[in-house]
């Protein structure tokens, strides 16, 4: 992964994986290249909360990753609340996979954002592959200052421009979802979205650097 990052001029990557120890090892080996976020399954209850606290304190992880599709929950389910509470207490952003029914729909993520307005939420894939969900991600995020959009896997280049111009120029992040998606493909989609160079620089790196205080 580091070799591919070098090939495409990527300075740092925000990474997560179902097995947090894999990310621990990557961050330990390449502390200047990787920023870890903790994969958390809300069904694990107190164990999940303890994992988040440990990864932040012992391994300098900087956020929480929730995957409603893989772990079979909806973001607006109360089972998620203990993790959101620790996110609020520790000022951790929460990255949430979006786009796949019935578990990962944008409206359920927005409902969670309404319940926890002090927690910064990143809607990963900004609705993903369905135009209806992509538009919902944009339209709903406009109304909630604590919601940010990440671009990986979202196929409509014009929606990156729309999100940047309507949701906010500090609230859209480029992402790769590597190794599932190719760095260059994800880059090209953003490059051709019709925004000026200064805006592309915000999306590609300035916004996430500011967001995570890197």
Indicate residue ranges for each PLM-predicted region.
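Divalent metal-coordination and catalytic microenvironments
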Residues: 5, 13, 23, 36, ...
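Active-site-proximal loop/turn and secondary-structure-junction residues that shape catalytic pockets
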Residues: 19, 42, 68-70, 100-102, ...
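Short, charged, surface-exposed secondary-structure boundary motifs
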Residues: 45-50, 74, 131-134, 159-160, ...
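Catalytic pocket-lining loop regions of alpha/beta-barrel enzymes
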Residues: 76-174
